[in-house]
Curated annotation (Swiss-Prot):
Signal peptide annotation: none
UniProt entry keywords in alphabetical sequence: Cobalamin biosynthesis, Glutamine amidotransferase
HAMAP family to which the protein is assigned, alphabetical: CobQ (MF_00028)
Name of protein: Cobyric acid synthase
InterPro entries found in the cross-reference section: Class_I_gatase-like, CobQ/CobB/MinD/ParA_Nub-bd_dom, CobQ_GATase1, CobQ_N, CobQ_synth, GATase_3, P-loop_NTPase
Organism: Citrobacter koseri (strain ATCC BAA-895 / CDC 4225-83 / SGSC4696)
Pathway(s): Cofactor biosynthesis; adenosylcobalamin biosynthesis
Reported function: Catalyzes amidations at positions B, D, E, and G on adenosylcobyrinic A,C-diamide. NH(2) groups are provided by glutamine, and one molecule of ATP is hydrogenolyzed for each amidation.
NCBIfam families membership: cobQ, PRK00784.1
Gene name linked to the record: cobQ
Length: 506
């Protein structure tokens, strides 16, 4: 009989995703077959399963914490905002349609049966399912059609643990207010509270914990300290709050342009984990000063972000830096923006726009989205500072709705294996100062990333490092650190008891 527990939050960005990953790691360490589940995820950070399905990055890294391959059933509904009012709806890993918020709210009840079927199929295969809610269960205006918080807990018949963020202040009010706004049947599902992101002397909380337990009748299962573990973030909230704003000095400085619709900024986690690299996310042209490499990231609204580049003067800043000899790279949408022309009759309604003109390429948007995991190797004779990366193996995934054609003065950056075919991907200029690719996750390829960083070191007159950095091993260590901290600060045995007392046949 499958056991399950669901983490819901008093608000967005309280740390649910990380704590779910931690529980997945703990149960995995304890020998239980464990899988994460989030019925509906809204995020621009997505990834691709081994069978070519698109799902949220949060559930992918939670699956990694559980020691299993990601499966689209772990995130059957993915919403990818394309503007402030509309989102692309991805169902079971494939694009279904675009909807505005009102239309989607009306549509949600039709998804309940499919979500429950998917959940039950996972429950047949795993000992424990760790569910994650979205935002807060106290969104009373959305309650009647909820499929991700208490609505999902009811479908799964599972207990709920409420996560509250003390770092933002008002933690006891947020706990009390959330519980007060729940219906009696919903409140009865909440079996514990975790206070997250605490800094300071925990004894100062004890009297408050006693009072909130008396007021609500719900026990506090633990107080998690603020942790310096390096794990992925689900969406752009962390960027907006400056989590990735690093001030420490490193040998190599990489500036990632933070376009308004940035997607898959997790591409750069492996770069930031390098011992000699500082990755900065920048929004103003003056912040490009001192960069050894400028990267244009992926985007869910490529032409909209291209317009922003020009209106914000960031385009001028990138072009000026390039004229001064600073290398420029682009990933997916960023690669498209580096070209001469983008022809879009699908995504934005903006038609045809000139790109930055740093690559002699033309991109045509298409209706069909490419979603696949791929492996390949860099071109055999890369020019300039990229030479050390020539011929190296790379792997990653593609998520894009465009095809890019290369013209004169640039060559393919790599060759990717797709089934029996070898397909050229990306582009690099003859001098090597500009390159782009559709390959997300490129920097997770350890040898390539070290060669790229060493190329930047040589340009600065620094000695290359022989440091062998293994990003997959590093991530595994971070999961273990998280699990250790949770075992120390949370009553994990109580969580086991909660699951055992409330497990129900699927």
């Amino acid at each position: 009989m499958t056991q399950a527990v669901m983490l819901q939050g008093t608000a967005s960005d309280v740390g649910k995703s990380v704590l779910v990953a931690g529980l997945c790691r703990i149960f995995y360490q304890d020998g239980l077959r464990t899988a994460p589940f989030k019925s509906q995820n809204m995020a621009l950070n997505s990834g691709i399963t081994p069978d070519g399905k698109e799902m949220g990055r949060a559930q992918i890294f939670q699956a990694e914490a559980a020691g299993i391959a990601p499966d689209v059933r772990m995130n059957p509904v993915l919403l990818k905002p394309t503007s402030d009012r509309k989102a692309q709806v991805v169902l079971m890993g494939k694009v279904a349609t675009d909807m505005d918020a009102v239309s989607y709210h009306e549509y949600k009840p039709r998804l309940r049966e499919q979500i429950l079927t998917v959940y039950n199929s996972l429950a047949q295969e795993y000992d424990v399912l760790v569910l994650e809610g979205a935002g807060s269960p106290a969104e009373i205006n959305l309650r009647d059609r909820d499929i991700v918080n208490m609505g999902m807990a009811e479908m799964a018949q599972c207990p709920v643990i409420l996560v509250a963020d003390i770092d933002r202040g008002g933690v006891f009010a947020s706990i009390y207010g959330t519980l007060a706004l729940l219906h009696d049947s919903e409140r009865a599902r909440v079996k514990g509270v975790i206070i997250n992101k605490f800094r300071g002397d925990v004894t100062l909380l004890y009297s408050g914990i006693e009072q909130i337990e008396a007021l609500t009748g719900v026990p506090v299962l633990g107080v998690m300290p603020w942790l310096e573990v390096d794990l992925e973030d689900e969406d752009g909230v962390a960027l907006q709050k400056g989590k990735y704003l690093r001030t420490d000095k490193r040998d190599i400085d990489i500036a990632v342009v933070q376009v308004p619709h940035i997607s898959n900024f997790t591409d750069f986690n492996a770069l930031a984990a390098q011992p000699d690299v500082r990755v900065r996310y920048v929004r103003h042209p003056e912040e490009l000063a001192g960069a050894d490499l400028i990267i244009l990231p992926g985007s869910k609204n490529t032409l909209g972000d291209l317009v922003w580049l020009r209106e914000s003067a960031m385009a001028h800043g990138v072009l000026q830096a390039h004229r001064q000899g600073v290398p420029v790279a682009g990933i997916c949408g960023g690669y498209q923006m580096l070209g001469d022309t983008i022809i879009d009759e699908v995504e934005s309604g903006l038609g045809t726009l000139p790109g930055l003109g740093l690559l002699n390429t033309v991109t045509h948007f298409a209706q069909d989205k490419t979603t696949t995991q791929v492996e390949g190797q860099m071109a055999s004779a890369l020019p300039g500072w990229l030479a050390a990366a020539s011929g190296l193996a790379v792997r990653g995934y593609e998520i894009h709705m465009g095809e890019t054609t290369l013209n004169a003065q640039c060559q393919p950056a790599m060759t990717l294996r797709k089934g029996e075919n070898a397909i050229a991907d990306g582009a690099v200029t003859d001098d090597g100062l500009v390159f782009g690719t559709y390959l997300h996750g490129l920097f997770d390829s350890d040898a390539f990333t070290r060669a790229l960083v060493n190329g930047l070191r040589v340009r600065k007159g620094l000695t290359p490092l022989d440091h062998a950095f293994h990003y997959a091993q590093y991530k595994s260590q971070q999961f273990d650190l998280l699990a250790d901290a949770m075992r120390q600060h949370i009553d994990i045995e109580k969580i086991y008891t909660i699951m055992q007392q409330h497990r129900e046949p699927v």
